[in-house]
């Protein structure tokens, strides 16, 4: 306001503090008022002077006299924009004054929570700033920080615009929580209410990414042309489902599948090793969460190692044919060939043999060895030799003499050797009866005889004589029964005869004794 209008106001204030003679006083109603910015208010200025006096309202605001009486005037103030101190004055002998405090309130024009970081590490403090433009009276204006509906902290709004900061210790529970600012204009003590304005909420994302790097599980060496698998794992990641995992070989990213479980993740890639990858390559895994990442890498060596080339000059030969066995491998690979002395490690090995029947189905093997990144690798190749030879029948495989007991189960074992396998038949001399070979059956006396066993194949035939003896017993059961009966009857007859004879002897002796006794009784006594 200009300096000149303020001087009378000061003088009026002093006059009010020092009442004039006569005791007349100036009063105002209301003594204080609070209105919404841009609003209007009516002020009644009156005086206790009972004489005609001059009185009025000292203000720079737009005022209108509404009505008046002998010692009072009602003014209306309009479009009030800011706090003001008004003075009613009257001049009755002396000038007296009465002040009025006019408070303007208005709501903040802007309440905003400053942008939050896209990701915030758990365990670190985060400073949030609430920006408030406008709003009065500031002594009754408070800024509140909210998490959802929960009040975290409040501070007074200071400055224009006001920037109020809050420090929050961020935890896992704050992940995806909504934060906002609210202003509280508390005018309840002035007969009004509590006026609140809120900002738009902002969502916070928190994360945990351990300092330890991810773990790579991969074979250290891989053969080109084969499928290989690589795993990348990391524990203690929160929220694990938001983490990005990159697997790459050299500069080429690998297609991977990521599985999440609680605070752990597992990325798996199945890759085919290409020939152009041969050599040592860097395999790396990178886990990114928020604005941080962790990376680990391993060396993988890709190698080419074809199996050794094992050849036979002829895989199938006639007996006593010379066969060349040869094994060969690429440069840098050493081979060892069965049939050669051990300890000869060369890239190419061969030898010759004069094939015999004992070499039929003989297996030859070649072993190739290659060292890759400190690992000794080995591959084997085998070939089988087939030797063609005529039939063989010898004592070991076809015994020339067999003795069997009639009724027992026996098997005639007679095996012929040869390549191709010969057909074997045994016919008995005389009647050309066929002898079963290799079957378990009861022995009969009819199979006894001399047989000619003949083995035949496209490469020849051979014959061997086989004698079969059968031990058997005649059927003397009836004779045995008769003899046994006669022996029994004879024994019984002899026993009966001896018994009767003994009985007659005893009877005879008894009779003689009785006669002797009788004669002794009948003889007269001799006179003395």
UniProtKB/Swiss-Prot annotation:
It is found in: Membrane. A motif (Cell attachment site) lies at residues 147-149. Residues 25-476 are extracellular. GO terms for biological process: cell adhesion; cell-cell adhesion. Gene3D superfamilies: Immunoglobulins. It is a single-pass type I membrane protein. The modification Phosphothreonine is found at residue 526. Residues 1-24 form the signal peptide. Keywords: Cell adhesion, Disulfide bond, Glycoprotein, Immunoglobulin domain, Membrane, Phosphoprotein, Repeat, Signal, Transmembrane, Transmembrane helix, Ubl conjugation. Glycans are attached at residues 44, 50, 125, 140, 178, 197, 299, 309, 354, 380, 401. The keyword Ubl conjugation applies. GO terms for molecular function: integrin binding. It holds the Pfam family ICAM1_3_5_D2. The keyword Signal applies. InterPro entries: ICAM (IPR003988), ICAM1_3_5_D2 (IPR048679), ICAM_N (IPR013768), ICAM_VCAM (IPR047012), ICAM_VCAM_N (IPR003987), Ig-like_dom_sf (IPR036179), Ig-like_fold (IPR013783), Ig_sub (IPR003599). Residues 500-528 are cytoplasmic. GO terms for cellular component: plasma membrane. Homodimer. Interacts with MUC1 and promotes cell aggregation in epithelial cells. Interacts with ARHGEF26/SGEF. Interacts (on T cell side) with CD81, CD247 and CD9 at immunological synapses between antigen-presenting cells and T cells. ICAM proteins are ligands for the leukocyte adhesion protein LFA-1 (integrin alpha-L/beta-2). During leukocyte trans-endothelial migration, ICAM1 engagement promotes the assembly of endothelial apical cups through ARHGEF26/SGEF and RHOG activation. This is Intercellular adhesion molecule 1.
């Amino acid at each position: 306001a200009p300096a000149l209008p303020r001087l009378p106001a000061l003088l009026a204030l002093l006059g009010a503090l020092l009442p004039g003679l006569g005791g007349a006083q100036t009063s105002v109603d209301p003594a204080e008022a609070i209105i919404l910015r841009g609003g209007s208010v009516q002020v009644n200025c009156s005086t206790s002077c009972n004489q005609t006096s001059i009185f009025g309202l000292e203000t720079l605001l737009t005022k209108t006299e509404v009505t008046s009486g002998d010692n009072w005037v009602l003014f209306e103030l309009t479009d009030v924009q800011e706090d003001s101190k008004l003075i009613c004055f009257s001049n009755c002998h002396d000038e007296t004054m009465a002040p009025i405090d006019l408070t303007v309130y208005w709501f903040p024009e802007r309440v905003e929570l400053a942008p939050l970081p896209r990701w915030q590490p758990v365990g670190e403090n985060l400073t949030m700033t609430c920006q408030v433009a406008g709003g009065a009276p500031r002594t009754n204006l408070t800024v509140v920080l909210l998490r959802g509906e929960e009040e975290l902290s409040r501070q007074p709004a200071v400055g224009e615009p006001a920037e109020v900061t809050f420090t929050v210790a961020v935890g896992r529970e704050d992940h995806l929580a909504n934060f906002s600012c609210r202003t509280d204009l508390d005018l309840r003590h002035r007969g009004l209410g509590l006026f609140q304005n809120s900002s738009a909420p902002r969502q916070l994302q928190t994360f945990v990414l351990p300092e330890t790097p991810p773990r790579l599980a991969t074979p250290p060496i891989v053969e080109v042309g084969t499928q290989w698998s690589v795993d990348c794992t990391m524990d203690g990641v929160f929220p694990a489902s938001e983490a990005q995992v990159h697997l790459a070989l050299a500069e080429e990213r690998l297609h991977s599948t990521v599985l999440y479980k609680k605070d752990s993740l597992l990325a798996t890639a199945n890759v085919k090793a290409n020939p152009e990858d041969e050599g040592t390559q860097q395999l790396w895994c990178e886990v990114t969460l928020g604005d941080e990442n962790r990376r680990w890498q391993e060396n993988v060596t890709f190698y080419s190692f074809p199996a050794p080339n094992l050849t036979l000059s002829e895989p199938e030969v006639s007996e006593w044919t010379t066969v060349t066995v040869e094994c060969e491998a690429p440069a840098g690979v050493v081979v060892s060939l069965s049939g050669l002395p051990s300890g000869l490690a060369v890239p190419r090995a061969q030898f010759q043999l004069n094939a015999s029947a004992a070499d039929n189905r003989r297996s030859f093997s070649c072993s190739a060895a290659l060292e890759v990144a400190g690992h000794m690798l080995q591959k084997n190749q085998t070939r089988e030799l087939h030797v063609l030879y005529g039939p063989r029948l010898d004592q070991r495989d076809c015994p020339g003499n067999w003795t069997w007991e009639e009724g027992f189960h026996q098997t005639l074992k007679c095996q012929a050797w040869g390549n191709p396998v010969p057909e074997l038949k045994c016919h008995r001399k005389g009647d050309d009866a066929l002898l079963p070979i290799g079957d378990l059956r009861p022995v009969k006396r009819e199979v006894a005889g001399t047989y000619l066993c003949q083995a035949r194949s496209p490469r020849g035939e051979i014959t061997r004589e086989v004698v079969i003896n059968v031990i058997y017993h005649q059927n003397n059961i009836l004779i045995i029964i008769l003899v046994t009966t006669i022996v029994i009857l004879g024994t019984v007859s002899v026993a009966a005869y001896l018994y009767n004879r003994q009985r007659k002897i005893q009877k005879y002796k008894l009779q003689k004794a009785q006669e002797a006794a009788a004669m002794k009784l009948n003889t007269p006594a001799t006179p003395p």
